[in-house]
Amino acid sequence: VITSLTSSEDSYDSDTIHNTMMKYFGVSADTVDIIYINNNDEREHLGSYVPLEQIGTKTFSCALVAPTTKGGIQVKTANLSWVTCNMIASTLSTSGVTNCQVVAASPFEVSGTGALTGVIMAYETASDVTLDEEKKDLANEELVTTGNLADTVGQSKATAVINETKLQVIENNITDISEITNIVNNISNDYDVTISDDQSE
């Protein structure tokens, strides 16, 4: 298995953080491909979707990504306050990934947008596969919708509503906007969640 590690390059003490996270992940420089992520990368990849207060001005979180051949998408996180396991798994799934192991973490609590930025980049490097750009954009939009909805209804309900909606739309091959809106409204009602018109879109 080829594994990729994303690491911060613009934090106040990047070498210390890098070494700390290498030990945490149990890897060394000769066993992984290392991709360095900085705050500009975060803003470039997530700036159109994620509030800048979540992105911040420094990158601290890292991700260890290992493509697999079975087992689905498995994600673990540590010290991430905004990015969740479900958000990372959903981002990978919507981007076209079916099997992968991810550990996303930071030496102290941060939002996790640095790790999130690097996950797709690391997967593409480790698997030598370039994922579809439209799917990656859709994954980012979905991520923000889930995050914003979670702010009002909680992470578990937000994830359930988004995932169930996505499942029904895909399984039934629905493309009509009004039908999708009805599905969103019905699922939201099932979970006793109120969704604004903007969130529904």
Segments (PLM) and residue ranges:
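Soluble oligomerization/assembly scaffold segments of membrane-associated complexes
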Residues: S93, Q101-D198
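N-terminal, leucine/charged-rich tether regions that mediate assembly and partner docking
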Residues: V1-Q101, T125
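Residue-level signal for protein termini and structural transition zones
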Residues: I2-D15, V184, D192-E201
